[in-house]
């Protein structure tokens, strides 16, 4: 993901920080938080904040807060992402050093231990460090005025870095959004903002984190409006824009100007093969709906199962992921099932990997592995796996067209894989504007925008028809959080298409029948 001398130096520095940061932060955790876990900064910082209140007008203070949030979120996102890359690089190096026989042990043990660490942290230390991170952000935003605790961000960083970096088949983007939302909220608390303004800092941090994680500032804006806020206002967009720009500058300064995927695809002129975006959209909608329903059903079954302790489940899923990943690696020579998997996805997108059996094995292995991880409650995100699924599905459709004699080259297959990424994102995440913007910014190829948009619309409409509630909101429902506060479902006209459980109240106040006024 990073290259060049500057990125090598940065990776070395990040490795040093990664080694000592948990110890330093853990020693100071109690001194920086009050009894409830909320931010409680030292008197020196309090005096600085008080001085700024006296010296700066309200507008200038707010501007300073947005700039600080962008800087802090950019640094947090880059450090977290590089930590994941470095940790998985260590796992790869150790497996290569161990040799053929012991490499299997390393590749199975690493995600097992990473899952164990994630499970212990998520059940014994900080329960909000488990899972993907987006649902926790939405719950804090709507139900707690966006007030996060410092320990939530810290333990999310540690748990998900260890889980994803050790090889569990998850992504870093959801945890990045969670960490940066908590960081922005903490800055708002530090400056003594009112609760409504602290709440407004959550989308600021979420957008800044996603911008730095993917190097996609425009997609970050769309995401917070589509998934988190549900509406656009001039006041909110100004702060989000500032933070997104600052975090993007931080990310590009530290890891480089290039896009996430450097593909070398040519500019495409309008051609008949772009009509394949329609079957790709249909396939992604079907697979995405099956994916969402499978996760939700297995989550419910996992809650009913008491035989395996909660803290042990991520370790067991990690062991299974290791076995699946090793099997796929032995059969294909590719390790894309493990961790983020962008290396193999890049090969497919650039047209260097066009063997259907290899692509299918990577797809199935990653699909099963992610479902195991998220059902077990392992700390990690969904964006990277979803993009991986879509890229592989799009490539398979493209290769099928080649085999049928349609006569296009490997670059077209790569373009169809890009379309698949956007379609799967729209199907599962349910953010259609974000879905095509994030693919465009990750690849910087504008010539496939029209088929990408058409495919995304097809995938989005079909997935909504087949499963009306998005994955995130369905998870919140399973957790007993009502959706009536969610902006996407405000207004009677939107409730008509939803099941009763989507708008019912879970926390009902009861009284004994014998009581009197």
Which residue ranges define each predicted feature?
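Alpha-helical transmembrane segments and immediately membrane-proximal extracytoplasmic
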Residues: 3, 7-10, 16-17, 22-497, ...
């Amino acid at each position: 993901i990073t290259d060049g001398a500057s990125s090598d130096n940065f990776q070395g520095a990040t490795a040093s920080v990664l080694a000592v940061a948990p110890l330093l932060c853990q020693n100071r955790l109690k001194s920086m938080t009050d009894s409830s876990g909320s931010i409680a900064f030292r008197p020196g910082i309090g005096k600085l904040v008080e001085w700024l209140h006296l010296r700066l007008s309200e507008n200038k203070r707010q501007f300073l807060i947005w700039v600080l949030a962008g800087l802090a979120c950019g640094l947090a996102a880059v450090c977290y992402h590089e930590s994941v890359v470095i940790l998985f690089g260590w796992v790869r190096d150790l497996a290569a050093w161990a040799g053929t026989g012991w490499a299997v042990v390393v590749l199975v043990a690493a995600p097992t231990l990473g899952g164990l660490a994630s499970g212990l942290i998520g059940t014994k230390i900080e329960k909000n460090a488990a899972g993907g991170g987006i649902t926790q952000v939405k719950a804090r935003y709507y139900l707690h005025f966006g007030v996060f605790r410092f320990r939530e961000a810290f333990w999310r960083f540690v748990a998900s870095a260890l889980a994803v970096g050790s090889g569990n088949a998850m992504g870093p983007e959801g945890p990045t959004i969670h960490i940066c939302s908590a960081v922005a909220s903490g800055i708002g608390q530090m400056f003594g903002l009112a609760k409504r303004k602290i709440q407004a800092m959550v989308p600021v941090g979420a957008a800044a984190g996603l911008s730095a994680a993917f190097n996609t500032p425009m997609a970050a804006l769309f995401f917070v409006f589509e998934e988190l806020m549900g509406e656009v206002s001039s006041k909110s967009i100004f702060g989000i824009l500032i933070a997104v720009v600052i975090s993007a500058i931080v990310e590009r300064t530290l890891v480089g100007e290039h896009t996430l995927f450097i593909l070398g695809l040519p500019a495409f002129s309008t051609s008949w093969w772009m009509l394949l975006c329609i079957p790709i959209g249909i396939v992604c909608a079907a697979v995405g709906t099956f994916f969402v329903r499978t996760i939700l059903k297995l989550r419910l079954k996992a809650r009913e199962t008491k035989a395996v302790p909660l803290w042990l489940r991520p370790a067991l899923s990690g062991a299974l992921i290791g076995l699946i990943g090793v099997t796929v690696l032995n059969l294909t020579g590719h390790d894309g099932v493990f961790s983020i998997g962008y290396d193999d996805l890049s090969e497919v997108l650039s047209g260097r990997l066009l063997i259907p059996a290899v692509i299918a094995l990577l797809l199935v292995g990653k699909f099963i592995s992610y479902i195991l991880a998220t059902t077990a409650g392992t700390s990690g995100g969904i964006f990277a796996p979803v993009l991986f699924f879509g890229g592989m599905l799009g490539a398979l459709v493209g290769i099928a067209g080649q085999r049928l004699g349609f006569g296009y080259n490997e670059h077209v297959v790569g373009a169809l894989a890009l379309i698949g990424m956007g379609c799967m994102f729209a199907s599962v995440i349910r953010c259609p504007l974000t879905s095509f913007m994030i693919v465009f910014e990750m690849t910087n190829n504008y010539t496939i925008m029209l088929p990408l948009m058409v495919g995304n619309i097809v995938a989005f409409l079909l997935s909504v028809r087949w499963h009306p509630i998005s994955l995130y909101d369905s998870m919140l429902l399973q957790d007993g959080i009502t959706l009536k506060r969610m902006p996407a479902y405000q207004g009677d006209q939107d409730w008509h298409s939803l099941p009763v459980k989507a708008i019912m109240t879970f926390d009902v106040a009861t009284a004994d029948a014998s009581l009197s006024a």
